[in-house]
Amino acid sequence: MNRNPDQNTLPNITLKIIETYLGRVPSVNEYHMLKLQARNIQKITVFNKDIFVSLVKKNKKRFFSDVDTSASEIKDRILSYFSKQTQTYNIGKLFTIIELQSVLVTTYTDILGVLTIKAPNVISSKISYNVTSMEELARDMLNSMNVAVIDKAKVMGRHNVSSLVKNVNKLMEEYLRRHNKSCICYGSYSLYLINPNIRYGDIDILQTNSRTFLIDLAFLIKFITGNNIILSKIPYLRNYMVIKDENDNHIIDSFNIRQDTMNVVPKIFIDNIYIVDPTFQLLNMIKMFSQIDRLEDLSKDPEKFNARMATMLEYVRYTHGIVFDGKRNNMPMKCIIDENNRIVTVTTKDYFSFKKCLVYLDENVLSSDILDLNADTSCDFESVTNSVYLIHDNIMYTYFSNTILLSDKGKVHEISARGLCAHILLYQMLTSGEYKQCLSDLLNSMMNRDKIPIYSHTERDKKPGRHGFINIEKDIIVF
């Protein structure tokens, strides 16, 4: 009687793969739970650990040379992690180990290992900007917005920074050059590339493979330092993850975006690195000043903001020929707030083809109303704008994630009015629409302004969800 090999041979192969991986004969439960992971397990089993150890050592030598650890310690940590499953009997923890080991064996070489080989020549592409000429203008603009009253009784969360940030920054500079199609930067470091006088801390990045990159980096740090590294996901920040050490010290964070979003983000090329176009960053800064917390930051360190603002103003002057003469025309656009329904109506007909923009302060309400409109042409730019946009029957619909400042009862403060205008202009830039005249008027509307006190402000939209995390040491993934 002939036997079907599928009934005997293949299960025996699967059993052998699992047995080799665990270093023991699996229990019946382990076998049935892990058999669908046989392909991943086999990749882990045949993975060349010696080559991997060599890559980690090279990464250590290049980016973490000041960390006091020996080559033998690195090797021991790596081999210990790749044999961890032999001492693990909890099915959930085994699944976590398999998932994280799979990421390492399939992606580490291409993502971080490649940083150890000779880099392409850097294409020097810097332009000399006269930032000094914009410093007084920036100071005048920021001074008129420096209106937050600091509540000394307010307890501020401390942002503890790891001593490894400088090492990770060195790695990130190379990473941004090697992976400039999938990873771009913004914030202080990107402006530092334009103006070396800018101070920066960690490097802010947007990328299309954030989770994989952060897992690989977390393991690199773990293998080099021996520290327990934790990856956290914050529910109210879209597609955001952060790496912290076991003492809750911040190492690096990243926003993940789709490739189609990456393709439309305005960017410029400097020294083999793509940075978010400073025009776009300037609009984001103007938008963020509507957030009361950001105005409090401004009052604490105005010179830090002044250096950034002056750099971006000089960039837009040079790039777009913006003339700062105080001619603001219809900027900021008229904004009327419905505090009960939490919607701001912005009159846009003087600048755009759509006559008005309805800005929702509650994302769920906007989503519901878009469904009622039966419109399927909304644009979601993820964390780039923190909002979707829809134009329907000559009306733009969008969501604004920041607070709205009021200068009097029922009256939108001009800081928030400009923030709302900037939010609309972000859409214009992302969709290759017209924005330069509006940009010129918006920037000129910030000149020669008196300080206007804040009467009150709306609350931010409350985001549902729970914190997620990956704890490498404890073999836990919660998302």
Curated annotation (Swiss-Prot):
Classification via Pfam families: Pox_polyA_pol (PF03296), Pox_polyA_pol_C (PF12629), Pox_polyA_pol_N (PF12630)
Catalyzed reactions: RNA(n) + ATP = RNA(n)-3'-adenine ribonucleotide + diphosphate
GO MF term list: ATP binding; metal ion binding; poly(A) RNA polymerase activity
Keyword Calcium among UniProt keywords: yes
Keyword vocabulary terms for this entry: ATP-binding, Calcium, Early protein, Metal-binding, mRNA processing, Nucleotide-binding, Transcription, Transferase
Protein EC: 2.7.7.19
InterPro entries for the chain: PolyA_pol_cat_Poxvir, PolyA_pol_cat_sf, PolyA_pol_nucTrfase_Poxvir, PolyA_pol_nucTrfase_sf_Poxvir, Poxvirus_polyA_pol_cat_C, Poxvirus_polyA_pol_cat_N, Poxvirus_polyA_pol_cat_N_sf
CDD domains reported for this sequence: polyA_pol_Pox
First-level EC class: transferase
Active-site residues, Swiss-Prot/TrEMBL: 202, 204
Domain of life, source organism: Viruses
Induction: Expressed in the early phase of the viral replicative cycle.
UniProt keyword Endoplasmic reticulum present: no
Binding site residues for Ca(2+) 2: 202, 204, 253
One of the GO BP terms on file: mRNA processing
Binding partners and assembly: Heterodimer of a large (catalytic) subunit and a small (regulatory) subunit.
Stated role: Polymerase that creates the 3'-poly(A) tail of mRNA's.
Stated name of the protein: Poly(A) polymerase catalytic subunit
Species in which this protein is naturally found: Rabbitpox virus (strain Utrecht) (RPV)
Species classification: Viruses, Varidnaviria, Bamfordvirae, Nucleocytoviricota, Pokkesviricetes
